[in-house]
Structure formats: C-alpha cells, structure tokens
C-alpha cells in the first residue's frame, strides 16, 4: 500500500478560474513538422494575452531545453516526453490557465491518453492538417532534407507514420487562408464553448 496520498488544496480550479475570468482548457495542436503548429498556437496566445487572458504555450522544442532535456527521440523517449508534457499541462489547467501545446504527437494513443486525464470539454484537439508536401517545401529546420537522406531515423511523415486525429475538435490547414483568419476560427470556437468572454476581445481591439 502506497504512503503517497493526494493533498486536497483549499483553493481549487474553479476558484482560480473565477479569479481569472476564464474557463481553463488545454488546446493540443498536433500535426507534422512544419505544419504551422507553433506559429498558429503562438499567434492565438498573443491574441488572448493581449485581451487579458491568462495563458501559457508549451512548445515541443522548448521543453527539451529543460523539462525533457534528458530524453532522446526513441519511441520510448518520445512517449515519455509527451507524458511529462501532459502532466505539466494538467497542472497548468488546474491553475486556471488556458494552455496551448504544440507537439507533433504522432499517435492517436498518445493523444487519447492525454485527453483521458482531463474532464470532458477541457481537452481541445486542434489538428494542423497541412499536407506533407507543403511541410517539406517549408522545411524551416532542414529536417525533411536530412530525413530523406536517411540522416534522421524515425522521422514522422517520412520514416515513421503520423496518425491523423479521427475526431479533432478543430482542423486547420495553414496552407489555406491567412494566419489572422485561422486565429479567428480558433477564437470563435473558444467563444462558442464559453472558454472566453468575447467582450474582452472586443475591448482590447
């Protein structure tokens, strides 16, 4: 029998959310490398932040500078990377934040495992569905070139599969339309499910 028990705090998620005037959620941006996940998530965070919302963006590269710096890119390490991020995101949502996470997260099992940690409605899957051909053309880090040469193993979309979501809450192809309209679609969705109050966005415009 474990001696570790959960300590119930006197201040809960609902109280923190009320103080911030928002409903905490996790927006999980998934898609191929170069699909535009970080760009889209960053633009949304900027719009929400400027309107006075309390946010935090977890980025796939950034967490490997600290939280996950001990991990490589084997299947086991990539799974552990996402497990840690999911737990951190859960703590941040409990703190009352609107959390944005931008990770390739190639398998449905990984994403569904993270979704299962949250109450219904608090995990919003955003499939950034930009086609592989466009992602390769962009190749901002030169990774596709290396993967095609065989210099990178288990590279998602080339030598390792990407499992597209079957029922994502939102699907956005960043090769269609402009960034502003894509951010608008995300904000409209968050407004519709009452995560944010649209009057605050209007006031900040």
Curated annotation (Swiss-Prot):
User: Would the keyword Kinase be found if you checked this record's keyword annotation?
Assistant: yes
Q: What class of enzyme is it?
A: transferase
Pfam families found in the cross-reference section: APS_kinase (PF01583)
Q: Report the EC number(s), separated by commas if there are several.
A: 2.7.1.25
Q: Which Gene3D superfamilies match?
A: P-loop containing nucleotide triphosphate hydrolases
Show the SUPFAM superfamilies listed in the entry.
Answer: P-loop containing nucleoside triphosphate hydrolases (SSF52540)
Instruction: Please state which protein family the record places this protein in.
Output: Belongs to the APS kinase family.
Name of this protein: Adenylyl-sulfate kinase
What is the gene called? cysC
